[in-house]
Design a protein with these regions (language model features):
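Charged, low-complexity interaction regions
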Residues: 20-28
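N-terminal compositionally biased, intrinsically disordered segments and leader/signal-like regions
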Residues: 9, 27-29, 247
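Short amphipathic alpha-helical heptad-repeat segments
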Residues: 5-12
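C-terminal non-catalytic scaffold/interaction domains in large multidomain proteins
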Residues: 33-249
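Hydrophobic residues in alpha-helical segments
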Residues: 19-20, 84
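A detector of low-complexity, intrinsically disordered, Ser/Thr/Gly/Pro/Ala-rich segments
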Residues: 6, 24, 243-244
Length: 249
């Protein structure tokens, strides 16, 4: 965008975008998730960042059972929901690890895995969570991803395959939008780095292809002569007639 003249639409848009990129209490990821829980949203780019928040196993009330099968269904379902609320969208591998740690078990055999799959399916059928492949989350968590720093997780959990596409897409959009214009590999590398991943390997590049293509399809970023720039929808904000939130996107 060319230099804006005071009083022009460009100047207003730049002010609007600056305010969004420097979020107040109503522009945080948590605030937008609460909004979209009530109103429904397709996508909201959030601009605050946070450390990866891990579930406290002591909060899940699962210990004291000799076998995983002895855990009451209601207690297991409640534990899954608490983990999802804290870490969602969460990969099945991490979800399983959290449940095992809370219940005092070291590994998940076929029977334990089956119970966890059944719990996910049951909660999904009830509409309490959304299932996307091996990921579980509240519906608004997929529409409003939070940008998290994964660097404090152990190596076994800190894997790109454990990060949902929506969070990877958010990191790409944020990286491009906050920088201006970036070559694809640079955007991918910087997007990974801000999430706590060290470098862009061939596998990482492959992993980021689908989120990047989706961001391009949604006009969150655009391709300019082979480089990436912020798209017209990067700053879009949903609104309802009764809500003061407006959009210039």
């Amino acid at each position: 965008m060319s230099a804006a003249r005071p009083g022009t639409l460009d100047a207003l848009i730049q002010v609007h975008q600056h305010l969004i990129r420097n979020p107040g209490s109503t522009e945080t990821c948590a605030a937008w998730r609460a909004y979209c829980r009530e109103h429904g949203c397709e996508w909201v780019t959030t601009w605050d960042s946070q450390p990866y928040r891990k579930t406290n196993p002591d909060d899940l009330s699962l210990p004291g059972h000799g076998r995983f099968d002895d855990i009451p269904q209601e207690a297991l379902d409640e534990a899954v929901l608490q983990i999802v609320d804290t870490e969602g969208p969460i990969h099945l591998f991490i979800l399983t690890r959290r449940l095992l740690d809370a219940a005092g078990f070291s590994r998940a055999g076929s029977r334990i895995q089956a119970r966890i799959h059944e719990a996910r399916a049951r909660l999904g059928a009830q509409g309490l969570i959304r299932l996307d492949g091996e990921f579980s989350g509240r519906p608004e968590q997929f529409a409003v991803p939070c940008l998290r720093d994964w660097s404090n997780l152990p190596d076994a959990l800190r894997q790109l395959d454990h990060v949902h596409d929506s969070e990877l897409m958010l990191s790409l959009v944020r990286t491009v939008t906050e920088t201006g214009t970036l070559e694809r590999d640079t955007a991918m590398n910087d997007a990974l780095h801000r999430m706590g991943f060290i470098r862009l390997t061939d596998n990482a590049r492959d992993r980021l292809q689908a989120p990047l293509e989706r961001a391009l399809e949604m006009a969150l970023v655009v391709n300019r002569n082979g480089d990436l720039e912020a798209g017209p929808k990067a700053f879009h904000r949903p609104r309802s007639p009764a809500d003061p939130i407006t959009s210039l996107g």
